[in-house]
């Protein structure tokens, strides 16, 4: 039986986001590590490798596919109520001890991460998204920057069928990969995991590339939402949250910030779960810093109105939510507040036809059978 590494090596093609160096070395620009890779070696991500001076990258498979509410990504200011067709591959450039997707993200790094690849082509995925009624196709689950060539191929097929596209990422990008990617994406969610470089290094990264990515995405006109998983004792100090939210305000006070609750997972099982009061405290700090749209997520019904979208000018209730479910929608057809006509930042459809949330899924983790 072939090993997972052998299976993945059979599902590659030459990459686009790299430079050739002397002595058959290559420089990969898919993520902020900017790996210089000698012949026969792999990058930090474990899935991009140098084959005699050519960078081989993941291609032609998925490890997870699901169609569910876009609010689950979470995107709260992009086509509320729409279905997001989510797909992912294997591998990540970070190694977070609390990763909730470790079975896919830590493949080839952790022997217990063994999600098998399923062969598929971009056109099939795009057509499947249409068949299931999706509005947007999203690359997620593992870190999509390290599989960016495949993501762009799927996005091209999705755009050809009239679908929007999105990225759910740790944001550890480079200017080169953003040049390659951003013509093909409409929305991008960045996980801003900490505002402390020392803590980021514990996860296998650095803070500065993520901050640069956030600034660059906003400058490029990509709709951007930020998520911070609030981990008690790791990134929840007043000082750190104040610095984080002030940074976001300096980029744009219109950027939605989601603060979500940690639960024990993977290798971090001795840290207490985040409480509702801790989420509300962090969210209130975001508001005090000047962010216009702050959300406390994944503890529905106990975080006050931090699940809802309100007008930044007059506080009119625009979108009422309970978890991923929309209970009221009042944004106008042209994306404005009905009370004061202030434009609501985001990506809005001309009408709201209700929320599609029930779709049949077969077992295999978060993956439907691809046949």
Residue ranges and their predicted role:
Residues 1-39, 238-371:
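Auxiliary Fe-S-binding modules of radical SAM enzymes
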Residues 2-83:
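N-terminal juxtadomain amphipathic helix
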Residues 30, 44-47, 91-94, 98, ...:
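Short, cysteine/histidine-rich loop/knuckle motifs that typically chelate Zn2+
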Residues 34, 38, 48-51, 95, ...:
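Cys/His-rich metal-chelating microdomains
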Residues 50-187, 355-363:
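Conserved Radical SAM active-site core
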Residues 109, 139, 168, 226-227, ...:
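Residue-level detector of family-conserved "landmark" positions at structurally sensitive sites
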Residues 119-277, 282-285:
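Conserved AdoMet/S-adenosylmethionine-binding subsite of the radical SAM
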